[in-house]
Design a protein with these regions (language model features):
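Active-site entrance/lid segments in N-terminal catalytic domains of soluble metabolic enzymes
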Residues: 1-127
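Electropositive phosphate-/nucleotide-binding environments in soluble metabolic enzymes
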Residues: 6-10, 47, 167-171, 199, ...
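Glycine-rich beta-to-alpha transition loops that act as phosphate-gripper elements at the mouths
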Residues: 32-36, 107-110, 187-200
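Catalytic cores of alpha/beta
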Residues: 45-48, 111-126, 179-183, 196-213
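Glycine-rich phosphate-binding active-site loops on the catalytic face of alpha/beta enzymes
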Residues: 69, 128-140, 195-229
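Glycine/Thr-rich beta-alpha phosphate-binding loop at enzyme active sites
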Residues: 72-82, 119-120, 124-186, 226-228
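Glycine- and other small-residue-rich loops at beta-strand/loop junctions that grip anionic moieties
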Residues: 79, 83, 108, 162-166, ...
Length: 234
């Protein structure tokens, strides 16, 4: 597990700027950011931290960005995406800061259709969000073959699981988001993420309603994955 560590802006901004500039034809770097939830911070300060971070991202020349509301390291019960009204407030403030740049919101798995529809209405419905990427890792208790805690250390009995094990949940979220998009008649992009380890997985996400597909774990273990997927599209 590696969490979401961040260095000072003086370090990550130049690095992000170089990465954006290095993207070749047909490539796009999507910067992802999130606000920090500090103990004692009130609602206004939490919103303001997202706005400040989004501004720092714009300074790198980013043409669009993703706001992460689903960091598993904050604990399942503290995930920002489980509070659609707060997400709505934050995205409206962020959108006012970043202007015409498209804003994507990264979602965890949300099992309830009503909650998911409220999320769409509170964000896309207010013109603040142009797309969703989903899903993030799924928090689970990890044990070894003997039933003992798999990851050493206090407080690490649960961790965010990624890869092949979560593909079904990712496809489910994409399909339900696609249905809500059609039901409400709203225009927003869906980026499918989770368990994409072979070309067939890309196809499954597209058929479920995703406009684009991302791979993290799959691409880490198979550097040729994107090339293999592209070959099937010819």
């Amino acid at each position: 597990s590696f969490g979401v560590p961040s260095r000072d802006p003086d370090e990550w901004q130049p690095d992000m700027q170089k990465a954006i500039a290095a993207a070749g034809d047909g490539q796009l770097l999507v910067p992802s950011f999130q606000g920090s939830r500090v103990e004692g911070m009130d609602r206004e300060a939490y919103i303001a931290d997202h706005v400040t971070t989004a501004h720092l991202v714009t300074e790198t020349g980013a043409g669009l960005m993703e706001m992460n509301t689903s960091c598993p390291n904050e604990g399942h019960n503290r995930l920002l995406c489980h509070d659609p009204h707060l997400v709505g407030e934050i995205t409206e403030a962020v959108k006012n800061e970043i202007g015409d740049r498209p804003l994507i919101v990264k979602l965890a798995y949300i099992p309830n259709d009503t909650d998911l529809e409220i999320m769409v209405k509170e964000t896309v419905g207010h013109g603040a969000v142009q797309g969703f990427s989903t899903i993030n890792t799924i928090s689970a208790k990890l044990v070894d073959a003997n039933g003992n805690q798999a990851l050493p250390g206090a407080g690490r009995d649960r961790s965010g699981v990624c890869g092949n094990a979560i593909r079904g949940a990712g496809l489910d979220m994409v399909g339900r988001l696609s249905a809500i998009r059609e039901k409400l008649g709203l225009d927003f992009a869906i980026v499918g993420v989770g368990g994409v380890i072979r070309p067939e997985d890309y196809k499954a996400y597209r058929e479920a309603g995703a406009n684009a597909v991302m791979s993290a774990t799959g691409a880490m273990w198979d550097a040729n994955l994107a090339r293999e997927i592209k070959e099937t599209l010819r």
